[in-house]
């Protein structure tokens, strides 16, 4: 198993009466070892798992796949405060990798499409301008060369129309193009646009990348992703945050029980009976 880049994190400040330090899991955060190449943060919505992931992204100054970097995103001001209060302990510092919130991805895809369209328009305008001015094809080529190179690089990395694919296809294509060896990847609920089959494809990509010295920290609700072999799982439903086994997770137990007896579950739920225990 490959060694990790980010070995642990701890909190070293922050006002407990101000969000996000009012979140119980964040308030109680002391030290959190990150001993394995794949770490999962799991918990109910509002438990703090995504907030901590965003704080780590701010502290690590990772590139962001989204419409704005963590350092400039107006919606992440509180998470930047958290980032300043976190102490990251590195085994091997890496500047490779990225932070991704599933909810931001489609804004990113639209931004890529807009950038490509603007480059194409600029090329056409240059051609018209140079033709009207009687400029040579050589001069036009010198003008258009960098624009063509930028378009080619975008298409090489993301395809000609990333936003034209299905959500799941676009997501997986992004991962294929942006995962590089030796990177740190912070993924917030990456299962959101993915079918079960696509989640298995993502697991395969993660397995391939950790064999190339990558590290992943993932906030998720997905029992499929959480099943990754030898992953560290931290529950944010326990205060302080605690490591838990896969079989102990409510996400796993409830999903398994439901699939084993869906009619029994649905009968009780639809009759508004007390929840099953």
Task: Give residue spans per PLM region.
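N-terminal pre-Walker A segment at the start of P-loop NTPase domains
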Residues: 1-30
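Phosphate-binding P-loop
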Residues: 26-36, 177-181, 208
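Phosphate-binding glycine-rich loops of NTP-binding sites
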Residues: 36-70
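Catalytic acidic motif of RecA-like/P-loop NTPases
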Residues: 39, 191-194, 207
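Flexible phosphate/Mg2+-sensing switch loops adjacent to catalytic phosphate-binding sites
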Residues: 62-90
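Conserved ABC ATPase signature
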Residues: 98-102, 111, 117-201
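Conserved D-loop beta-strand region of ABC ATPase nucleotide-binding domains
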Residues: 188, 218-219
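C-terminal lobe/lid and adjacent interdomain/linker elements of RecA-like ASCE P-loop ATPase modules
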Residues: 197-215, 222-277
């Amino acid at each position: 198993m490959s060694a990790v880049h980010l070995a642990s994190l701890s909190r070293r400040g922050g006002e407990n009466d101000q969000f996000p330090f009012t979140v119980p899991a964040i308030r109680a955060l002391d030290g959190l070892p990150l001993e394995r190449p794949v770490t999962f943060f799991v918990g109910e919505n509002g438990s703090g798992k995504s907030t901590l992931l965003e704080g780590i992204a701010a502290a690590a100054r990772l590139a962001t796949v989204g419409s704005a970097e963590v350092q400039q995103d107006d919606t992440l001001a509180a998470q930047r405060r958290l980032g300043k209060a976190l102490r990251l302990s590195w085994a091997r510092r890496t500047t490779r990798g990225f932070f991704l919130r599933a909810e931001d991805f489609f804004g990113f895809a639209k931004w890529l499409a807009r950038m490509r369209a603007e480059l194409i328009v600029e090329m056409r305008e240059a051609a018209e301008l140079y033709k009207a001015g009687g400029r040579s094809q050589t001069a036009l080529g010198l003008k258009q060369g960098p624009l063509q190179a930028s378009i080619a690089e975008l298409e090489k990395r993301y395809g000609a129309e990333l936003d034209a694919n299905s959500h799941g296809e676009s997501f997986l294509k992004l991962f294929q193009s942006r995962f590089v060896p030796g990177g740190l990847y912070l993924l917030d609920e990456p299962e959101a646009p993915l079918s079960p089959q696509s989640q298995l494809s993502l697991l395969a990509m993660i397995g391939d990348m950790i064999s190339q010295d990558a590290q992943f920290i993932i906030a998720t609700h997905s029992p499929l992703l959480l099943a990754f072999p030898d992953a560290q799982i931290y529950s944010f439903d326990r205060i302080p945050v605690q490591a838990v086994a896969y079989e102990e997770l409510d996400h796993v137990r409830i999903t398994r029980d439901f699939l084993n007896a869906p009619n029994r579950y649905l009968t009780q739920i639809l009759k508004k009976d007390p929840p099953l225990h």
